[in-house]
Amino acid sequence: MRKYLLATAALCALAASANAESVRMSVGSYNLNNLPFPVAASLGFYKDEGLDVTTENFAQGGSKVLQALVAGSTDVAVGFYDHTIQMQSQNKHVVGFVQLARNSGLVLAGTNDTDFDPAKPETIKGKKVGITSPGSSSDFFIRYYMKQHNLSDNDISIIGVGSGAAAVAALQQGKIDLLVNYDPAATIVVERGLGKILIDARSDQGAKDVYGGIYPTSVLYATQDYINANPEVIQKVTNATVRALHWMKQHSAEEIVAKLPDDFVSGDKQTYIKAVEAAKAIFSEDGKFEPADLETPLAVLKSFNDAVAKATIDLNTTYTNKFVKAAASKGGN
């Protein structure tokens, strides 16, 4: 009887696998802004929704994921909201449908002996500044900083160094003087005594100091065409991801890290736990977009991106709360 039950269970599992809907999801890097995505995957929430998720980590920043989405080589992107604005200025319709992080989580770090002083912005001149990749939100950060202080992009060298361990190594090895990046890189730099945080946009106040307001960052987004053609898949992805946001809210940083694959954890585990603890405040609790907050990234992009500045951007078409609201009505954690 037991063998029969086991065999039946195995057949049911095979049938469920065969009926699973395939969806390709890509992420620019496993910085902590994107953490709800691997948490949902590790806890099996996408499988629970009947999805067979294929994941690609470009490990080079959000601009690469955006390119893949527009080219049709991925279905859903895990990246920053500001890319939806950028695409609308190019007459391409990309829509955010779950907000993961409600603040940037970005910092500007320097070596311990750096002579750059944020109180004297001109001291950044001549510096090599590491970002995740050209066209990424870390790139937007430094360009906005330069613009706000009446400095030119030509006053510095902007260099793509990736994120996580690669970014930390670039600073440690002297390939760059300053680093614009996320946790865990930010916490690793400090914990290892490799440098110090000079500008910190991880908190609400920090975001207001840097950007002038709350700056929504990591979201799940897809092309409008894909959303229109696959609303059930988008809903299932949303259900699983919102469930992960709820789960993260209810668990400690240590419990969250314990659920992640070892190869996801950058640096030593204790430092990574500290990084997750530092980042927990940036995550959305319910996945909803707050329309007023979306004005901040629009203002930032307009300040240095000519295409965005010249375009008439309709923020209402850059996001939707439809699927998050449906997930909330479904309930469950």
What name fits each language-model region?
Residues 227-307:
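Secondary-structure end/capping motifs
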Residues 14-20:
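Sec/Tat signal peptide C-region and signal peptidase I cleavage site
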Residues 4-14:
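Sec-dependent N-terminal signal peptides
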Residues 166-261:
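Pocket-lining segment of extracytoplasmic ligand-binding domains
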Residues 34, 66, 81-84, 121, ...:
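Extracytoplasmic/secreted envelope proteins and their assembly/folding machinery
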